[in-house]
Amino acid sequence: MIKTVLFDLDGTLLNTIDDLADAGNWVCAQNGWPTFTVAQFKLMVGNGIPKLVERFSPADARTPAQLAATLAQFTARYDAHKEDKTAPYPGIPALLDALKAEGIQCAVFSNKADALCGGIIAHYFGTGRFDAVRGNRPGVPTKPDPTGLYALMTELGADPTATLFMGD
């Protein structure tokens, strides 16, 4: 029986792709680079913001210094506009409430920066629906590496054989 459900954030709980694409395209336009469709951005996401920035940056703009500058541009723009179009997927708040009513622990584990995750969750889902919210933190590899997931399960006292992860 499942006793704990861990959720990814972007693309699982929240439809964030439009705000991610808008921020990415703004950075591209500011730098005179080609822009992309939302469908193209969907193919670029899934391994954290630094990897997304690398993927939309032209090959000749991928030195470590250039990527750091582009990441700073993207982060500033996204932080200012991360709630413009983002919304929970239909049925997600009701699902979370049903899981909690059954006594199932719920937590978030995302490749999005840890500093952003708590505020985003509070904004869209309030408090009390999640037992823990964890984003990308220094020293913890991003998904698909399972290190952070195992650490979160340990923190929650969750049995891995009774835990479900939803997302990528």
Which residues does each predicted region cover?
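Helix-loop "lid/cap" segments that line or gate small-molecule binding pockets
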Residues: 27-28, 48-63, 120-123, 152-153
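Helix N-cap/coil-helix junction residues
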Residues: 33, 59-62, 126-127, 158
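Substrate-recognition "cap/lid" segment bordering the active-site pocket of phosphatases
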Residues: 84-87, 113-166
